[in-house]
């Protein structure tokens, strides 16, 4: 697995939205910053693993087990707040 340099929050959100919408595109629907990823059934047990792997690559480090909580992955905005930190 190639580890890339960490992304700033704004770029992280943009890239994550692009990745999610490309990967899980549904006719007539798209994922936004505040879309409920579990609530609207965009994520399942396999997709969350893919999302965790993508996030780890984007932030340049593994996510500790204790940070893998549903509330940290409920939306793109929540993921960015939790893992991408603030823009400098």
Residue ranges and their predicted role:
Residues 40, 79-81:
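Acidic pyrophosphate-coordinating catalytic loop
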Residues 12, 33, 72-75:
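Short, conserved alpha-helical segments within structured domains
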Residues 2-29, 81-88:
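Thiotemplate assembly-line natural product biosynthesis machinery
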């Amino acid at each position: 697995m190639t580890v890339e340099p960490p992304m700033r929050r704004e770029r992280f959100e943009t890239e994550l939205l692009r990745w999610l919408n490309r990967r899980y595109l549904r006719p007539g629907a798209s994922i936004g910053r505040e879309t409920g990823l579990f609530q609207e059934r965009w994520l399942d047990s396999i997709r969350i693993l893919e999302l965790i792997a993508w996030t780890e690559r984007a932030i340049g480090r593994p996510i500790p087990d204790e940070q893998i909580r549903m509330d940290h992955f409920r939306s793109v905005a929540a993921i960015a707040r939790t893992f991408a930190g603030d823009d400098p």
